[in-house]
Amino acid sequence: MGKRLLVQRRGRGGSVFRNPGWKRLGPARYPPYNPEEFKNKVLVGVVKDLLHEPGRGAPLALVEFEDGTKMYMIPPEGLAVGQKIYYGAKAPAVLGSIVEIGNVPEGTIVSNIEIRPGDGGKLARSSGAYALVLAHSNGKTLIQLPSKKVKEVSSEARATIGMVAAGGRIEKPMLKAGKMWHWSRAKSFKYPTVRGKAMSAYAHPAGGGHHPKGLTPAPRNAPPGRKVGHIAPRRTGRKKGASRTPTQ
């Protein structure tokens, strides 16, 4: 009797593939957007703690504001416990301040940027990421993303001054398979991944050694367990005669 393929097990959604959401601290979002309050008031908050959330590359900062509200924020590089931050459209543009991006001077580094006011922050959120404010025009702000692409966002969108902490994290190599296993487990990835043709015949259609390596194309209506490899391809194999050099 054969075994279910990895894609079948993943689709079933067993405990191995289920996202360990109970380990998460909470969403790293800005407070609910109140235009009147955000534009006319400046709240002062204090960083109570810097925390690690399994599965997240950047740390999280627990911030408590003077009105008693708390939130988890993605901290910029250099933010420390006990440091004050400011929340408001007209807040001073200092490290950690959450401001309206339309009021940020051109050339400033920002992170955790909203595309539309109130969406909680969508851009430049991973460790070491930042965007550069390029220009303001007609209620829109041009920013340069980490990919060097220039994007237009609403000038009323919120952003954090500074670059996200934990930059250079991916430069450190894993070195051991065990490190990769723990990292994958925190993100609910299946590791290690075994090639189908390296398996036994009962575990995968491409497994076993009694037939040549590789598979025939699978039709679109193939049953689960057979639908692997080339699925309803237009063609397979090497394209012959495509790369001929033109003659003089």
From Swiss-Prot:
* SMART domains on file: Ribosomal_L2, Ribosomal_L2_C
The segment annotated Disordered runs over 203-248
Going by the UniProt record, its keywords in alphabetical order are: Ribonucleoprotein, Ribosomal protein, RNA-binding, rRNA-binding
| Chain's role | One of the primary rRNA binding proteins. Required for association of the 30S and 50S subunits to form the 70S ribosome, for tRNA binding and peptide bond formation. It has been suggested to have peptidyltransferase activity; this is somewhat controversial. Makes several contacts with the 16S rRNA in the 70S ribosome.
Output this protein's name: Large ribosomal subunit protein uL2
PANTHER family the record matches: LARGE RIBOSOMAL SUBUNIT PROTEIN UL2, RIBOSOMAL PROTEIN L2
Here the segments flagged for biased composition (Basic residues) are 227-242
- Looking at the UniProt record for this protein, which Gene Ontology cellular component terms does it annotate, in alphabetical order? cytosolic large ribosomal subunit
Query: Per the record's keyword annotation, is Ubl conjugation included, yes or no?
Result: no
* GO MF: rRNA binding; structural constituent of ribosome
Q: Which family does it belong to?
A: Belongs to the universal ribosomal protein uL2 family.
